[in-house]
């Protein structure tokens, strides 16, 4: 959670597996909460190396966003240690083509929450690859899941998460948009049935 009492929330290592737009927005949110006792520390991002100057390109994309504007703070690149420094936070950039290639404990990362924002795997079997990596405790998918995995919308059904749930989905953007509204209506009036339409950007879903 990005919320909590600074006196009671134990810091949790976070790894972003993938660094597309969703990953970069998540990075901004987590970095913005660092030092406030919110409990999440962004320790690393995992990506495939694209070309020379990869670190600077990724740092540049983190600095700028057409909707949210410029990054609030400073971002620099540490080429020698393959890292991005954002507001003083050292974020290791790990280059790998699959989860099996990564040992997070080698980077001082333990009991980590991996947030998979690649969309490559959307079922428990695929996402379970992360749990086999040393240093990983839990996995969150930033897309609607397939199969029996829980789709969780914070504020609606987050209390359904059990300690044994090692992999969960943060549900779809449409689900996150409409479910809180439907919950308010259902709590007050009861929803018998309904129809929802969404205008969506082009994706490969």
Language model segments and positions:
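N-terminal Rossmann-like NAD(P) cofactor-binding subdomain of oxidoreductases
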Residues: 1-203
């Amino acid at each position: 959670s990005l919320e909590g009492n600074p006196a009671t929330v134990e810091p949790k290592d976070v790894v972003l597996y993938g660094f597309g737009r969703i990953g970069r927005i998540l990075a901004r949110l987590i970095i913005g909460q660092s030092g406030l006792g919110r409990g999440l520390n962004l320790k690393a991002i995992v990506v495939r190396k694209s070309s020379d100057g990869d670190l600077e390109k990724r740092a540049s994309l983190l600095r700028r966003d057409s909707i949210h504007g410029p990054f609030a703070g400073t971002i620099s690149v540490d080429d020698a240690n393959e890292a991005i420094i954002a507001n003083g936070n050292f974020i290791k950039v790990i280059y790998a083509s699959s989860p099996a290639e990564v040992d997070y404990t080698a980077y001082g990362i333990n009991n980590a929450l991996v947030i998979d924002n690649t969309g490559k795997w959307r079922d428990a079997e695929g996402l379970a690859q992360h749990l086999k990596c040393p240093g990983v405790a839990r996995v969150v998918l930033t897309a609607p899941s397939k199969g029996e995995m829980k789709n969780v919308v914070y504020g609606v059904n987050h209390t359904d998460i059990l300690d044994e749930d090692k992999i969960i989905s943060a549900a779809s953007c449409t689900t996150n948009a409409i479910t809180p509204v439907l919950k308010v209506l259902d709590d007050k009036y009861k929803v018998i049935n309904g129809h929802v339409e969404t205008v969506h950007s082009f994706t490969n879903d």
